[in-house]
Every structure is written in structure tokens, then in C-alpha cells.
Amino acid sequence: MKKTRTYLLRGILATAVLLLIAFGIALSNARVELTEHGAHQRLLVPIGIGMAGLNTFAGTGDQVHIPGFLDGPVVRRKADGSWAATWFCENKVQQLTGSGTDLAIDCAGKRHVFPVARTPMVADAVFDTPADTLILSDIEGNAHFLDAALASLAVTDAQGNWNYGDRHLVIAGDAVDRGRDVFAVLWRLYTLSLQARDAGGAVHLLLGNHEQYLLRGNTSRANRDHLYALTRMGGQLDVFGPDTLIGHWLCLQPVIIKSGRTVITHGGVNPVVADAGFTVNNLNSAMRRYWSGDMPTKAELDAVIGPAGLTQYRGYLEDGEERFARATEDQIDEVLAHFGAKSIVVGHTLVERVTALHEGRVWAIDVNSNTARPEALLIRNGEPAAVPTGVARQLDEKGGRRLTRPFSLFVASDLAMLKDLVMSNYALSRIPQPY
């Protein structure tokens, strides 16, 4: 028996050694994939006749320089009204402290001004229908599209300021991730929220699954250039922490609103959520309690952040297999009856144009693709209709120009990159699922 055990242990050890040797040989022929600006994307390891791509989410890079790119600012305000700001400009982090109402940043020859003295009040989640409510979804860090679409639709003026009077703008989730300009999008909406309030209007930023990923430290969908900048500024969890202006503001945003007789949420309302009796205010309260560390009940968590909850549900358009069944006409009627609504607006699931489904009881508005018709949803005097934005999304669906270079086991920076790759994937695996 002892000999058998000894042979078995030797066999296991020999196999492990052979695997390590094979992995070392593979690494000696590996390549590092980078963005065109030098941020690390993947480690390409030869496997057989192909290459296996190991994603890195560590925010590392080789002499990264991103022309004209401003990321941030991350602003923390003190009790005495002063503030401290950190931002990334092209290839380095800069900092400033001050006490004024605005923060002015000069980056790559362009001036950017941010309001830092006030936090926008969160608009009521249940409100009477304004004359006009314009709804967009799934901006996903595409600041160029957002700015151009809002100008085209006369929501903003030529200087990018609020021009929509007492009307309402709704972003139905997923303003962040994928695109590089996440901070630019959030600061634009933050600023417009202040200006809209002053004019008697409102901006509603609903949380989608990607805002939830961001606030929980899930970097798996982050643009790598943006992730590099985030890492230089302290990492995603720190940069969007509740002690920052943008992080605190995001944690206050709703997951569902009701405008007159129209419910708006990112993914949709699972019939199970309606059956549980949750109101709009119940659901938003549960989400805010979660961010503050006051853990909601399991039923509340399933409703607001679960795999079949408000931000992940796709049941009005497709079958979610184990997670949820496709909603029946009767179930949609029951959801609407529960909220006293006649229609529900959802993003999250791609469509080729802003589409009325289920005889107009559901409006699907996620047109975030290059092939979809450039449209938004306008609810005028309670009646929804698709309107052209006049602006294409212009998505870089291939992820930009990618570069590769050899990986070396004998270069300290490459070994550090490998360690950081492993640790970043380990950190992602440690994020509790589903919540």
C-alpha cells in the first residue's frame, strides 16, 4: 500500500512538473495584446495550433498615452465646502484642491468645467406626465453620441447646456461601461440634472445592470484605456466610492420610475416582482439600502439586482431559459395593472428600431448598435412615439486597433503584468453572485 501511494504521489508530482514546463514553454511564446494607446487587453498564449486569450482587468499598460483623453475628475467634497479633485489627462494623474463652485481643468489644450458645489436632487420616481419626456437607453460610455443626440433633439443648446425647459429627460440604464468616456457621460448627466432642476425640468438616470457592475467593482466590461486611467486614480471601487460626488450621486439613482401611466426601467418587470407587491418606491428604497450596506430581503434583492430582476430581465422579448420564461400577454397585463400603468419602457435587449410590442403595452428602446435605426422614444402628452435622433452610434464593434508584442518571462514588468492578470481575475471571482 505504501509503495502504491508513493508511486501515485510521484506520478502526480511528475504530471504537475510537466504541466508547469509546458505552461512555461507556452508563455515563452505568448504575446501581449494592447490597445492602440498601450493599455493591456489580453495575454495570448499558444494552445495547439491556436491562441488562447487570457483577459486582464488589472488596468496595466506599456507607456500608455491617450491623446486628448480626460478621465475623471474624481471629486471629494469636505464639510467646510472645500474639495479635492483627481483626474487623468493623456498619460498622467493630476490633482487639485479648492473651494470654488466650479472645477476648471485644462487637458490637451481644452478647458473643461465641472460644477462641484452642489449635488443634484434626485427627481421623484413617481410623477405626473410632463408635456414631453424624452427617453434614451444604453449610452455605454459613448459621450460623443450622447452630446450629439441631445443637441439634435434640442435638449441642449449649442454650448451643451439644458435647453428643455420644464420637460424631462430619461436615461433608461447602462450609461456606463464598454465605451471609454464613462466619466464624460456621467458628468454631463450630473450637470444637466442641476440645470434641469433650476429650469423646472428633470433628468432621470436609471440604474442598469452596468451601473450595478460598476458600483460593485466589476471591471469585466470596462474599456481598457478607461480602466488604465481608473487604476492610476485608485481603482474603480475607490473612484466611484460613496465619498465621491459621482459615486454618491449614482448610489441615489432609481432602478424604476413611473411617469403618469408609463413605467420605465432598464430590463423589465418580471411578473414575479409584481406578484410580490413591490411598489416603485419600495424597489428604489431597496436598491439604495443595498448601496448603503443595509441589506434588503432576498425577495427585494432578487427584484432589483438579481439575474431576473429589473436590470437583467428580458422576458418581454425573449426566453431566459432557467432564469425566466418569456412573459405571456396575461402576465404583462398583470404587471401593468399592479403599477396602474398602460405601458412599460425597457432598454437592455437590442432591437433594430424603437419598437412597440404587445400591442403597444411594451416599448423596447435599446438601439445601441450600428445597424439599428437612430431613434429615441418621446412621450408627448402621454402618447409614446419613436423620434429620429439624427445621430448614428458609431460604435467601434471590433474594440479599436489592437497591437501585440512578445511576452517575456525574463522581464520584470511582464511578470508583474502576469501576476496582475491573475489577481484581477481572482478579484472578479470574489464578487458575490448574484448579489
What are these regions (language model features)?
Residues 2-435:
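Feature recognizes metal-dependent phosphohydrolase scaffolds
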